[in-house]
Amino acid sequence: MKKHKKLLLLMTLILAFSSVLAACGADKNEGADNGGTDKPKEQVFRMNLASDPPTLDPGLAQDNTSNTVISSVFEGLVRKGADGTEEQGVAEKWDISEDGLKYVFTLRQDAKWSNGDPVTANDFEYAWKRVLDPNFTPASPYAYQLYYIKNAEAYNLGDIKDANEVGVKATDDYTLEVTLENPTPYFLSLMSFQTYFPVHSSVEGNASWATKPDTLIGNGPFKVSQMTKGQKIELVKNDQYWDKDSIKLEKVQMSIVNSSATELSSYRNDELDYAGHPTGNIPTDQLSAIKKELGDELMIKGISSTYFYIFNTTEEPFDNVNIRKAFSMAIDRKAIVEKITQGGQIPAFGFVPPGIKGESDEYRTEVPDTYFQENLEEAKKLLEQGMKEKGYTTLPEVTLIHNSDDNHKKIALAISDMWKNNLGVNVKVQNQEWGVFLKNRTDLNYQIARSGWGADYNDPMTYIDMWTSNGGNNDTGFKNEEYDKLVKDAYATSDNAKRMELMSKAEKILVQDNQVVMPIYYYSSVSLVKPWVKNLHLDYKGDIDFTRAYIE
């Protein structure tokens, strides 16, 4: 997701970025088809994870690392093709009512779980209602993604007690009927999102089912054969998968190493076939040498994702909006992308990134990200004003947390230096292991925290509805009735122009009026792939799909 070149290259990348995203994520697989090797290769794909996946339960996953594994071990009703369009998954066909409120999915009868059991419509109904169950512990961070379904929100919040009132029903073993609250143009694309994946009913009552290969029953192209915490995850081809003849890889080996330098070294030594985004990183200080040495294997691609910091709005000193605004105005985003990340990133002054569809063009083209400017003098005034409002003579001690990663650390240290030089504020930088970091964010046990967000589907709503008062991924404590109403109204209207207007008003409240988030840059994906790896794809939001890849 990270790195930036200089001005001439940036312009080139922006053009490439636009064409890639206009195609909704089609991937050229640069480097994978150039050249070759005389070295014989087994059908084994080797990559690295910078951390252990916090969970392999589709109902609980909320991060790229978890989803990379989950999306190869499970499959939804539809799957995303290489060009970003919906393809048949477990569903062999679907019908949508004229009013857009009812979806009827017909499941293929040859879909099986990895233990040989048939995958049925009941498995989907069970999985979705499991996520929505108000007693589901821990609560699913993505339960709100199912709120498009009739009565889903009311059931999840406890206003409706009977799960049978939720608009999802298996009418027979191979027919799933879904009724929505409102017409939702992107609902079909959500069927390839992990929270909508089926779960085998055997997980009931077994909280640790997703931590062991023998109880982790999936229905995707691969199954987990080995899991050793802090060391590796190994996947093997699932011989029960309905489309197994299209799967060429026999194994996927995932090392777990939290060092971008070690990851790069392993790649150079032919111990990895892939390195970098989305589950690892390429050291930014090595990019110049990599371009000379491994230029044909380097992929730099603009993606629809945003790198940002969040403020805990419930704790001092960031319960004051002027202090939040001062911190956001006092950093130099251009310096960060040109001197640190160096991989085609674009400074961000909004939350929704380029490449996301708007009314008739990209949303970001129709709604420019002019919500604030970098202004040191104004930042100093706002800090002084905020401190006066809080009764401070000295700002309380401030800590910025980030998950352990060399590149996140470089960015955090650079930004803390900017705050010191520009505002006279000392900020402690603290790195945390991924699982600990996520829990501290969720529990609001932080002051400022690193974050990143990629599209779950190609619509601005994927960046907007997460900040509602009950949003499962709203780790800021931000609650705003006007914001919540704008999101609900946007859900309810089928007028696309009106939807965009409502969402742009919500984004203004989030970024300009309240500065809940501090946008830093719009991501690019930087990765390396060996020339013998074929048919590997990164989609418009930067997710990797190796399920149909092969070694040649």
Region annotations inferred by a language model:
Residues A154, D173-Y174, T179-I247, K251:
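Gly/Pro-rich hinge or "lid" segments in bacterial periplasmic/extracellular proteins
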Residues A330-D361, N407-S416, L438-E552:
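Detector for C-terminal structural segments
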Residues P347-G386, D405-K409:
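Structural transition elements
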Residues E92-Y142, P317:
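Aromatic- and charge-enriched surface segment that lines or borders ligand/interaction sites
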Residues L49-T68, V90, D117, A139-S140, ...:
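A structural "hinge/loop" feature
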